[in-house]
Amino acid sequence: MPKRLDINTILVIGSGPIVIGQAAEFDYSGTQACQSLREEGYKVILVNSNPATIMTDTATADKVYIEPLTLEFVSRIIRKERPDALLPTLGGQTGLNMAVELAKSGILEECGVEILGTKLSAIEQAEDRDLFRTLMQELNEPIPSSTIIHTLEEAHEFVKEIGYPVIVRPAFTMGGTGGGICNNEEELIEIVSGGLKHSPVTQCLLEKSIAGCKEIEYEVMRDSNDNAIVVCNMENIDPVGVHTGDSIVVAPSQTLSDREYQMLRNTSLRIIRALGIEGGCNVQLALDPHSFQYYVIEVNPRVSRSSALASKATGYPIAKLAAKIAVGLTLDEIINPVTQKTYACFEPALDYVVSKIPRWPFDKFESANRTLGTQMKATGEVMSIGRNLEQSLLKAIRSLELGVYHLELDHLKELDKETMKKRIIKADDERLFVVAEAIRQGVTKEEINEWCEMDFFFLQKVENIVNMEREVKANVGNMEVLQAAKEMGFSDHYIANAWNKTEREIYDMRKESNMTPVYKMVDTCAAEFESATPYYYSTYGDENESIVTDRKSVVVLGSGPIRIGQGVEFDYATVHSVWAIKEAGYEAIIVNNNPETVSTDFSISDKLYFEPLTIEDVMHIIDLEKPEGVIVQFGGQTAINLAAKLEAHGVKILGTSLEDLDRAEDRDKFEAALTKLGIPQPVGKTATTVEQAVAIADKIGYPVLVRPSYVLGGRAMEIVYRQEELLHYMKNAVKVHADHPVLIDRYMVGKEIEVDAISDGENVFIPGIMEHIERAGVHSGDSIGVYPPQSLSEKLKEQIIEHTIGLGKGLNIVGLLNIQFVVFKDEVYVIEVNPRASRTVPFLSKITGVPMANIATKVILGQNLVEQGYGTGYHPEEKEVYVKAPVFSFAKLRSVDTTLGPEMKSTGEVMGKDLTLEKALYKGLVASGINIPTHGSVIITVADKDKEEALEIAKRFHEIGYNLLATAGTAQSLTEQNIPVQVVNKIDSEDYNLLDIIRQGKAQFVINTLTKGKQPARDGFRIRRESVENGVACLTSLDTTRAILRVLESMTFSAHSMKEITQTKRHEVVHA
């Protein structure tokens, strides 16, 4: 069936900010879909609130709206643009829920907008747990015995009948939000109450736990002609009970017999047909390992995290084809873009093994509960490809960037059998490492299988790795053993440690005897047809399929998995850099390992190597390709950290030199450079011992800011108010020694300013200056940023511009630089300089129209700023106001403190733009998920140091009609100032207290600032967590609170009696 000609304009809904459960995979699928629809000649209108993505680039769609994804704003866009159709299945759960909300509000009918791809009825049938259960019963498809509940009482009834454990799955949520496994009544009450709150329709499915079955996923496609195919099937190494986003996944499935494979394949196709889905769909199934009994777990009637993985694992571009199917094309009419010969109705075949390992944020959140269950906790993932499972797994492990190069963790070596058993039974992020350790210590596969039901096949693979370790250690210097270990995916790093050599020595040994990897192509058809994709993975074998051309090439290093501190912003910069390299006439080669991102789409670069970002894996590619050089500026800290090792191998680093990179990162060299340039900075020193640290802090005076050098996202950074806190930090947070010094700075309570600039060594061009709403001390990634700055005098702005130009030239920067300043007592101080792309590059590029990563790449390749039409100085400011607001994923991470400080905690960002700061802030806050009611109650509990400042805030809340609630101490200071306040009991009171008010939804805002040390810190923690669990906006910074007040004041009308007005005027005359 040819494409539809009765529609012209299509609205695509994006997935909004990156949160746990919904990451960069939707930037990839959304970008693909927009391009795909435009190829077919449709006009595409995109709405998405996330400025950090390629998807929201003006070139991606005909019109791009970066607006909040709420009914109010999307309805406005529909009324203004009048699209013929809406495509919601590429924006994750956000896009689906938005479509349902739009349909229910009547706006689609009013404006005559049709939903494309998957019909509303199919979305509801798949997402509404009750309707889905009914459909499965009609199809005679087995599902675990279950019931639908809307109250806690109903949950208790079900459990009486069926017994524990039960699984709770809230309707219309993603990433398992609010769900979990309940083993007893206490867990049931907690999880069901939370689940009902998180579900937009207050509905949960309770089902008998089938934990322990194999978890299998099928990624299927169907068109309007009822052609349906399986793109890829995947198997979770972790049995049912761990969310698939938190599971280690392999593709294709490894332990299914042909009969089992065909049985589950037929079920998946039957379900997609029954739902009438046109496009991509993901079916999750559970298979009993001891019989042919299976259960249908759930269906995602949309492009998902698994489809991004399946696309990269097979090379078959699901989102691109789903968009074409949505406009009426059929699988037998669409050419597969990979082979460019076969049609899309051929099922892909794989002649390699793919492994996906999630990347969790526990290195940032020491206190988080690391146990894995049905609620997702990972922020991102890595993927790797190998010729055997062992190779594939070991490559994935070293892609995670946790400083781990092998399936072993030193701190697990001390574990006794009982502890290992506990950690294997109750899965956490290190379970596979614990399994390997258990096998090393002689625990049998049978015992481990009994503990966690992990399939013997996978346990055998882990045992193969452990046996090979013994071989390697027993045969030092033996080249045959080395060859065998390399074929199994062992790293030079591991072998060097085992053989007591350096990694470089092993690398040289291999090179001398020609023991180097070859590169194989990912072609969707297991080499059955010739293929046109330049998409490669390494393995040890005979024939190399990556043909080196005679064109000059440049290698760009990507940024690896998405994690807190290094998000999709760096992928954005990477992609733009690749495009600029192509424009400049070079061959662009990219190395990356994140299956979710646009940069790992094979159509972006001239060559894509899906490989770990370690020195060994990158050097193999460089040895083969012999590029002009490598660009490390766009891959975040991942790429920067490889610069020194690459240079030691004689590789040319393009852009800012290694020496100059080091000058910006090394504290003493940086101080010397600033002194020479005459640029002021907060007083600070470097300590290499604990005693030194104490002496420095005493001399500078508290509070001080302490942090390790060379760090991204503010890991292990703290503001310390007294000596015992400093000692606690030095002993627990960092291991200080000469190679890892700790920086100690005077902490200045001032306004923070952030600048991104491009330097070519002669000229320095500044696209924009941003002002942070939160004062210095809150990480820049967690602050609300405003452009253009609203409260900087011209004098200060000139100083900032002057210092930026001075630093660009003085540090010999070639390419991008990001500088953070603090304004303290009307003086500008430099806090830090990052000689690389920063997380504000996409935001500033979009609002100023200056393609920063593109210009910087061309500067790096030798075309100066003047030749590109830019000079030195500050780009003229835009008239509108733009706000970048952070988005957090605290609801997914129980027991993590939500307080903002120098350590970054946000997972994503949104943008709000409008003519005034208040309107832009309103949009930014609403887009980030903060509800802003114009009246209600606000709870105020603040640290003593903030009491005075909180008075003015309380007064303003009172004036716009808010009801104030406070605990005794804070209430007393308010009453003394004649501010009406209601006293509430502290949380340790037996009576109705502060937490009850939060739980019952009787407060709209909670203002709680941190009291350091002592008991109040724990109280504050409980107040903040309770707010998150109950969806109440909890403000831990008085600056953020002021910003929200500005918005509220602009939305509400004040009410003053006439007498008050005349008194005010008289008062002004007296003071004039």
UniProtKB/Swiss-Prot annotation:
Ranges of residues in domain ATP-grasp: 133-327, 671-861
Region (Carbamoyl phosphate synthetic domain): 547-929
Region of interest: Carboxyphosphate synthetic domain: 1-401
SUPFAM superfamilies, per the entry: Carbamoyl phosphate synthetase, large subunit connection domain, Glutathione synthetase ATP-binding domain-like, Methylglyoxal synthase-like, PreATP-grasp domain
Residues the record lists as binding ATP 2: R707, R746, E752, G777, V778, H779, S780, Q820, E832
Keyword set, alphabetical order: Amino-acid biosynthesis, Arginine biosynthesis, ATP-binding, Ligase, Magnesium, Manganese, Metal-binding, Nucleotide-binding, Pyrimidine biosynthesis, Repeat
Keyword Ligase in record: yes
Assigned EC number: 6.3.4.16, 6.3.5.5
Chain positions recorded as Mn(2+) 3 binding sites: Q820, E832
One cellular component (GO) term of this entry: cytoplasm
Sites where the protein binds Mg(2+) 1: Q284, E298
Amino-acid positions noted as binding ATP 1 in the UniProt annotation, renumbered to this chain: R129, R169, G175, G176, K208, I210, E215, G241, V242, H243, Q284, E298
UniProt domain MGS-like: residue ranges: 930-1072
Binding residues annotated for Mn(2+) 1, in chain numbering: Q284, E298
Function of the protein: Large subunit of the glutamine-dependent carbamoyl phosphate synthetase (CPSase). CPSase catalyzes the formation of carbamoyl phosphate from the ammonia moiety of glutamine, carbonate, and phosphate donated by ATP, constituting the first step of 2 biosynthetic pathways, one leading to arginine and/or urea and the other to pyrimidine nucleotides.
Record family assignment: Belongs to the CarB family.
Protein name (database record): Carbamoyl phosphate synthase large chain
Species this protein is from: Bacillus mycoides (strain KBAB4) (Bacillus weihenstephanensis)
